Amino acid sequence: MLCLCLYVPVHNSDQIEVEYFESNGLPSELKSLKSLSVLLPSQEFSTYRRWRKKSLKTEEKEHDGQLDFEEFVHYLQDHEKDLKLVFKSMDRKIAGQVNANDIVNSLRDLGVHISLKQAEKVLKSMDKNGTMTIDWNEWKKYPTLQPAENIPEIILYWKHSTIFDVGESLMVPDEFTVEEHLTGMWWRHLVSGGGAGAVSRTCTAPLDRLKVLMQVHGCQGKSMCLMSGLTQMIKEGGVRSLWRGNGINVIKIAPETALKFMAYEQIKRVMGSSQETLGISERFVAGSLAGVIAQSTIYPMEVLKTRLALRKTGQYKGISDCAKHILKTEGMSAFYKGYVPNMLGIIPYAGIDLAVYETLKNTWLQRYGTENADPGVFVLLACGTVSSTCGQLASYPLALIRTRMQAQASVEGSSQVSMTGLFKQIMKTEGPTGLYRGLTPNFLKVIPAVSISYVVYEHIKSTLGVRSR
């Protein structure tokens, strides 16, 4: 492509030098999108059309196919600004040049891992003088109509913990771009995630309560399966009893999400990271610490959830009555029963969930993400389901011990046993399989929980004015 400089008058500005690529004598007086599509490579033209669709107001979207040249100039200006931001973010030494290591490090900070050889291959496609470094002039000439926002879009498209809610709040928080912080989009994403979690948990509450019953009562000599458990719940308290404990489970979403997000941002500052996003290991450390802080604060609500899920008809009048009863009969310490295994469970859950999700994400990006960072609904749901399932499988024994410790005083004939004592007791009387009681309903709720939370998240996000990119 030959480079051509034009001086084009743009509204409310002086004459602006606009540099773009001429393809086979591309004329300056283009009249229609059809003409442009003939002269430009299909990938570059589709990128321009996506940009145009995003920038147009709703009432202007049904246009007549005519291309306004002034509008095309604005596109080139916006594109060059995006390129400049990406170049500066990679040029950490402020040397005015970017090498293969800079590309590797920048992508690693975004959770995308490529080899030095792959980075050199990318570099060679832009390097015109064979120095294996590129300056700003070489960088901005790398096809003007290619999507410059591809790297930041990885963060925007691959949200994980904000979108998917499987009932366990142990995931590492998602990263937000500088743009999302400045525009206030971050809180819209969090509100959307909170609303999605509320709907998702409510829809899967019967399976969640069944899991708790199987974890606690499955050790009392009677085997409890899915159908017998559901039948027992309905027989004892009617259909409404299937949702016992769901109220407090939904209420705790807001404070826990807010605490985790604020703690995560503060920990990032303490860690002294100057980058927009953290690397995988840093995210794991910061996310785990944020999870510990949030869980420590709202843990009494976790105990209340378990007690309310196990309650019999007429035992408590509501959440406050249950809290008063526990405080009166067992004391304040009862609200932190099972705290240690719960905290220990954060590490395997958060670590494996993050590692699996990032591995799946990187695999997809390396194979299919060269042209577009948007993975599509199916890929996102599949990655979220697999990573959440792996995380829960690894931390499930600790979750079961936590639940039994929370329920000790509410189970007749149950003695107060420590975490290690309870582990030994389960292994002795039930064997290794005893550590996985209730796993079936827990896994059965993952796919519907992930699917429901994604659909509701997208709907609320759209209502709050967050457009899908």
From Swiss-Prot:
Positions of Solcar repeats: 184-270, 278-363, 375-463
Membrane spanning residue stretches: 190-207, 245-264, 288-301, 338-357, 381-398, 438-457
SUPFAM superfamilies associated with the record: EF-hand, Mitochondrial carrier
GO BP, one annotated term: ADP transport
Assigned GO CC terms: mitochondrial inner membrane
UniProt KW keywords: Calcium, Membrane, Metal-binding, Mitochondrion, Mitochondrion inner membrane, Repeat, Transmembrane, Transmembrane helix, Transport
Residue ranges annotated as Mitochondrial intermembrane topological domain: 1-189, 265-287, 358-380, 458-469
GO molecular function, one term: calcium ion binding
Residue sites binding Ca(2+) per the record: 64, 66, 71
Location in the cell: Mitochondrion inner membrane
Main location: mitochondrion
Membrane-protein topology: Multi-pass membrane protein
Superkingdom, taxonomy of origin: Eukaryota
Side of membrane Mitochondrial matrix, spans: 208-244, 302-337, 399-437
Annotated InterPro entries: EF-hand-dom_pair, EF_hand_dom, GDC-like, Mit_carrier, Mitochondrial_sb/sol_carrier, Mt_carrier_dom_sf
Domain EF-hand: 47-80, 78-113, 114-149
UniProt xrefs under PANTHER family: SOLUTE CARRIER FAMILY 25
Family as reported in the entry's similarity comment: Belongs to the mitochondrial carrier (TC 2.A.29) family.
Known function: Calcium-dependent mitochondrial solute carrier.
Annotated protein name in UniProt: Calcium-binding mitochondrial carrier protein SCaMC-2-A
Species this protein is from: Danio rerio (Zebrafish)
